[in-house]
């Protein structure tokens, strides 16, 4: 009898594993939203908690308020603000991880300079990470991993990007054997073409993409007008060069890409940006942007010992691989993986912050997972706010937890994004309630 039960249990586990391996991009089955069954876990002294987070406004690359501001200055602004807000001595930090995509060496030198500009002593170590568009979230995962393995009890996870001042589109030195592998060759497909591939392969119409983009703009405009971003944004005073080359001092205090006057008619007039007859336009794609964000994490016991606030708890993190030529579908596979690790379903989540690299891929992921539209990016996403590559993941964490705090009740939220070359990342956070 016990042998039969053991075989049944083993078969069940095998079916679960096969279920995760199935449902890849070729499958048409969607993740079904199960009835809400969330039970909040007991607080543990070993929990990795988010203490606090801040971000800069997001500037329009090449023409906005940060077009002449170096990334070390953007990063220093948020590092300084987070430490000052919670009155934490900088020498208490066990490590700093900074996500960056476009700077040489993932911005390792730039980030260390920013550390010193922020008054953080040389005794605090720092590393840089580049997992493309998930770099900011990967920094969060890296710091959380260090806390979990006992390397330290408190650390700072950041993301930063100056797309104004960085060289985009150069893959670096690569093998002459590239043509021998379809997947290797697909890693060089322009991101806009991967968006077109998703739209064509999964039937995401131009009208649906434009409607999604309009909703993003409308939500962001509403949030901005209500002051919803005020608590998370660090105003940055900087200098900008005018058309004559003269320096002017300005203070950037809100996101520059939000366009309240956006209409479906206006979006419909935009030409395809990446190929003739395509459906991906400047209006239904993320904006090229500048910005930085920082998130302070700690072991719960250390946060309590230091009298620090607890804004959220990191419950799970997952990264998955998908075909490079349709890289935008990554969240559709990363989110279920992260939810499973947390023991949750789609219905248990109040807010999904899914990066809007392109409306095509964001829509695909939302529809594939059966996520109610009202749960997706309630304050707008990258189409309206902008997408400073290395910053985005950290920015999403800050925005998510601040919005859950505004709502007040205990709840779960998800941060997710697609990743160039074919990946997706997702993390589940719990807001503990007011």
From Swiss-Prot:
EC number: 2.3.1.16, 2.3.1.155, 2.3.1.9
GO biological process annotation, one example: fatty acid beta-oxidation using acyl-CoA oxidase
Keywords, alphabetical: Acetylation, Acyltransferase, Fatty acid metabolism, Lipid metabolism, Peroxisome, Transferase, Transit peptide
Annotated metabolic or biological route of this protein: Lipid metabolism; peroxisomal fatty acid beta-oxidation
An annotated Gene Ontology molecular function: acetyl-CoA C-acetyltransferase activity
Parts forming coiled coils: none
Locations listed in the record: Peroxisome
Induction or repression: Peroxisomal thiolase is markedly induced (at the level of transcription) by various hypolipidemic compounds in parallel with the other two enzymes of the peroxisomal beta-oxidation system.
Residues with the N6-acetyllysine modification: 183, 244
InterPro entries to which the protein is assigned, alphabetical: Thiolase, Thiolase-like, Thiolase-like_sf_Thiolase, Thiolase_acyl_enz_int_AS, Thiolase_AS, Thiolase_C, Thiolase_CS, Thiolase_N
Transit peptide stretch: 1-36
Activity at various pH: Optimum pH is 8 with acetoacetyl-CoA and 3-oxooctanoyl-CoA as substrates.
Catalytic residues as annotated in Swiss-Prot or TrEMBL: 133, 387, 418
Region feature PTS2-type peroxisomal targeting signal, mapped onto this chain: 11-36
Gene3D superfamilies referenced in this protein's UniProt entry, alphabetically: 3.40.47.10
Reactions that this protein is recorded to catalyse: an acyl-CoA + acetyl-CoA = a 3-oxoacyl-CoA + CoA; 2 acetyl-CoA = acetoacetyl-CoA + CoA; tetradecanoyl-CoA + acetyl-CoA = 3-oxohexadecanoyl-CoA + CoA; hexanoyl-CoA + acetyl-CoA = 3-oxooctanoyl-CoA + CoA
NCBIfam families, alphabetized: AcCoA-C-Actrans
Subunit record text: Homodimer. Interacts (via PTS2-type peroxisomal targeting signal region) with PEX7; leading to its translocation into peroxisomes.
Biological function: Responsible for the thiolytic cleavage of straight chain 3-keto fatty acyl-CoAs (3-oxoacyl-CoAs). Plays an important role in fatty acid peroxisomal beta-oxidation. Catalyzes the cleavage of short, medium, long, and very long straight chain 3-oxoacyl-CoAs. Medium chain straight 3-oxoacyl-CoAs are preferred substrates.
Family according to the record: Belongs to the thiolase-like superfamily. Thiolase family.
Name this polypeptide is given: 3-ketoacyl-CoA thiolase A, peroxisomal
Species, as recorded: Rattus norvegicus (Rat)
Lineage: Eukaryota, Metazoa, Chordata, Craniata, Vertebrata
